[in-house]
Curated annotation (Swiss-Prot):
Residues 120-132 have a biased composition (Acidic residues). Residues 88-100 have a biased composition (Basic residues). Residues 176-186, 240-251, 402-434 have a biased composition (Low complexity). Keywords: Coiled coil. The keyword tRNA-binding does not apply. It holds the Pfam family Neugrin. This is Putative neugrin-like protein DDB_G0288135. Residues 85-143, 171-214, 238-279, 402-437 are annotated as: Disordered. Transmembrane segments: none annotated. Residues 193-214, 252-279 have a biased composition (Basic and acidic residues). It comes from the Eukaryota. It comes from Dictyostelium discoideum.
Amino acid sequence: MFRYLQQKSNQINYCNNVKIFSNLINNVKINHYVTKKPLSLHRSKTIKKTQKRDESIINGIVESVPKSESTTDSIKMLMNQLNEKLKSPKPKQKSSKPKLTKPTQSELLMNENENQHEKDDDEEEDEQEEYGEGVLNFDENMDLYDQNDRLAEYEMDENRMEGMEDYVFDDDLPINNKNNNNNNNKQSQPIIETKEIFTQKQQKEEEKEEEEKKFIKRLDNKINIKREEDEYIEDEYIENDNNNNNNNNKYLENKNKNNNNKIEEKPELTKQQQKEAKKRLEERIKKQYGDKANLILFKIEQRKKNGQWAPENKVTRSDMEQIRELHKEDPEIYTIPVLAKSFRISLEAISRILHSKWSPDQTKLHKLHKKKVLENKEKYSPYSKTNKEKNYINLSSQAKININNDNNKNKNNNNNNKNKNNNNNNNNNNNNNNTQKEKYKFTPNVIPNSLLQRIDPKEWYHQVKDYNNYRIDLEKKKNNLKNNFEKNTNEKKEINLKSSYERLLALENNKLNK
């Protein structure tokens, strides 16, 4: 603001005391703008709005500022002095206003070129911010220099698209170097790059073809080698079989000779020595095998008796019956060796099954069943998963108690003890009791102990709980009935009735007394 006022003060020629004006400005701190600073002529975009202000300042005319807008007293004094001097008459002077002239064609062209350069610079800066240092060149001549080369690449490309011959992709365009400013360099670079790319692609394709050929040759060589090895192995295998057979025969002959020599050399053992040797053998087997030692010794004894080990598979009663039925149907088809293979049993065992007439008793079967249960507890236990159906017990319909049932029983027992002499009355009472028992039979749905043992506590916990609650309630009701009956009987002990007529009279008297 200070500079602006100083510049404009030089244009005012009619001010006599310029020193006073400048000293006041230097000593005062202005807090309010008197006039707005106009923009320079070469940058101004709003010339029309600021034209009047510029003309007034150039001609020495300053707009008066009201006192209310000023902030300090010093500014007020300064503005008063200026207003007094401005009101004084003005000498006529030549206008320093520049005369406007029409620009020539050369000037217009220069301005247009400068504007275009500025726009291009701005666009380049924006593109550099988006794409980095490398900026794509979109000149008009780009489609001409690489047209032939690009068509050749298009024809060689396997993944080409039909109808896209004239289309130029961004990847095909070269990147400008900022250092190369000449147009000749710009046109010469892309041609060299396209040729180099084309040659590189051809070289890569040739290398791939060579590698494929080498790979195929390697596979052929490996296949041929494997065939030769297989043939060689087959020949060796046949030769080895023949040699092995000969060697085995020789080995067996030598073994038999050695065994014969050893048998001859071994001395005969006495009974005591045999028992001692047997004990030693049993001790060794027990140390090595533990619990399985008894089974192994049992098999050794069978081997001595029968000359064979124990069978591979044990046969059940149902299997034995099936063997007999099959042999009866077709003895020519279901022969002993066929059955031995199917059931995995020795020939001697099948012959025993077919010719035996022994049938076990119930005691024997009971013992066998116990052994099965002890050996296979998981299979035969009531808690197993397979026996869930057996554990099922219904308690949906529980027994109901009738009070008359217990009262009639107890009354009849007392009457029989008291009235032994009256046979007729006793007979009538017994007949009545039989009829009442048939009507009111007490049949509680009690679970037997055999079923209770089978119940799984995890699945049938609630069922057992209901049963226990039912049993407890039943005992409570019985106790209540007994107590009530004793009260009634104590009252009746004092009365000794001889006949039914006297009994009725006594009952009526009791009711009246109550």
